[in-house]
């Protein structure tokens, strides 16, 4: 076989491979663009409010990039509302179950406006494991630009991250006292000289909105918020808690937790900003009860609790 023929064979093979990859990229890219458009349409058909601008495909040849302009998604009663100037979804042809998301100009409202956060830049990753286990990570990308619009007394956040896990596998039967958790989470926030870490899970039916009917259904069907660990560190204070929470008939927090603190004087001073009247002489380890619209530590009232929905 002559060298010229060998060269032609190699070149022809490379050209065919390149054409095949181009065809594959555009097939996967256009299919993904259609799936994103269809998903937004399904959200709208399900009763959510969805508005958006252009949906564009780019990224050839290395990545698949979907850009969505001016995306505004909220539940019907706006219990959850997210507005972004631009959201970008990034993946590759060979990793269809793993997406990286970058979002700019984010306005986020949670729990009927109980928490309203503005974040200039967010990044997230979406990965499906074994076909039915979803893991989502959202973080501030190290940028200290988070602003909590509703006053809370909290210092400005320098960085934060939220890890969510959901198992879509069907439950054959319930085992033990508690139902399988429908959502696992871990939240971490850094405010310079203070850190907050919150890990736990939620069981019961999923909340489709922050409304009386949805919360009542979640409560009546055994909904439970499990606090595996809540840890707050600032200066000489390290405050920890773990427990379980649900709602009473008037939609007020109901449950109990174990509390421990290294410095109750500092804890009493800082928590007074949130309306908690804690004794600076509390035991190093104590208990918290939430019942009948009251928060009690060792039987002493420290705060009144209102409903979680107006």
Enumerate the predicted regions with their spans:
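N-terminal positive-inside, membrane-proximal cytosolic segments immediately preceding the first
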Residues: 1-7
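Glycine-rich, small/hydroxylated-residue low-complexity segments
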Residues: 8-310
């Amino acid at each position: 076989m002559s060298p010229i023929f060998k060269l032609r064979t190699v070149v022809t093979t490379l050209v065919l491979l390149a054409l095949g990859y181009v065809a594959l990229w555009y097939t996967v890219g256009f299919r993904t663009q259609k799936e994103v458009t269809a998903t937004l349409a399904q959200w709208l058909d399900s009763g959510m409010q969805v508005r958006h601008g252009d949906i564009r495909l780019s990224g050839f040849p290395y990545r698949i990039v979907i850009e969505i302009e001016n995306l505004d998604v909220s539940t019907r009663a706006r219990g959850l509302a997210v507005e972004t100037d631009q959201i970008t979804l990034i993946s590759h042809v060979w990793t269809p179950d793993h997406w990286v998301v970058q979002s700019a100009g984010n306005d986020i409202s949670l729990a009927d406006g109980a928490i309203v956060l503005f974040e200039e830049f967010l990044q997230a990753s979406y990965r499906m494991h074994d076909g039915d286990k979803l893991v989502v990570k959202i973080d501030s990308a190290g940028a200290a630009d988070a602003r909590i619009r509703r006053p809370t007394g909290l210092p400005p956040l320098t960085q934060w991250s939220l890890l969510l896990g959901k198992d879509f596998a069907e439950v054959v039967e319930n085992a033990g006292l508690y139902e399988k958790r429908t959502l696992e989470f871990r939240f971490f926030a850094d405010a310079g000289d203070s850190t907050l870490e919150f890990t736990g899970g939620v069981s019961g039916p999923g909340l489709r909105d922050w409304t009386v009917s949805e919360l009542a259904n979640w409560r009546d069907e055994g909904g439970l918020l499990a606090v595996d660990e809540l840890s707050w560190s600032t200066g000489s204070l390290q405050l920890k808690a773990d427990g379980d929470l649900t709602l009473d008939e008037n939609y007020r927090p109901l449950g109990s937790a174990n509390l421990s603190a290294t410095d109750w004087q500092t804890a009493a001073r800082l928590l007074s900003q949130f309306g908690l009247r804690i004794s600076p002489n509390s035991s190093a380890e104590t208990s918290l009860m939430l019942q009948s619209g009251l928060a009690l530590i060792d039987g002493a009232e420290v705060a009144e609790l209102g409903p979680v929905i107006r």
